[in-house]
Amino acid sequence: GKTLGLRSSEIIDARVSWIVTRRMGFRERAAIEVVGKGSKVRRLPLTSEQLGILDGCLKARGLGGLQAVPPETPLLTNLGRGGKPFEGLTRGGLYRIVAGFFESVALDLETSRPLDAARLRAASTHWLRHSFAVEALTKMNVNIVQAAMGHASVSTTGRYLAPEEEEMSDALAR
């Protein structure tokens, strides 16, 4: 998948030092070592595409790539309104970026798919994490999703197994 299901707090806390190369199974892989709730660390594999995006984000800020910046450099920042390239995003800044993106997509869908537009306008940063969990649980074992999301209990992950209203309606109508 292209997403990692990170919490908002993990996204804004993420630093270049979190990007590592580690042995996973029989090969070396790039990963992000996420510092989650309770300062627990979990390791999630990164694709070359994801590494390229992170590298490009740093370069767009006028910094070197992943290999050329101090380890405590935030992975993401808001450069609008005088933002500084070495200052990380705030929770409010992340929310505004995500909400702005959803709003621009909702505007495009307004006439052709008004219900989808309304859903996007109501979406939040946590909705992205929720979407990751729901999608991941259709493809992966619940224990893998639990570990990826940093849940202490499989019952927390299990909450995402509840069918969406639309999915249940479609299934029962068959």
Residue ranges and their predicted role:
Residues M149, S153-A173:
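Catalytic-site neighborhood detector that most strongly recognizes the C-terminal catalytic loop/helix
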Residues G1-S9, A31-E33, E135:
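Short pre-functional
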Residues Y95-A147, E166:
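Short, basic (Lys/Arg/His-rich) helix/loop patches that form interaction surfaces
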Residues G5, S9-A14, V145:
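Alpha-helix N-cap/helix-start motif at helix boundaries, enriched for small hydrophobics
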Residues D13-E72:
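Conserved tyrosine-mediated DNA breakage-rejoining catalytic core shared by Y-recombinases
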Residues S8, V142, V154:
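Helix-turn-helix DNA-binding elements, focusing on the entry/boundary residues of the two helices
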Residues S48-R119:
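Active-site/catalytic core of tyrosine-dependent DNA strand-transfer enzymes
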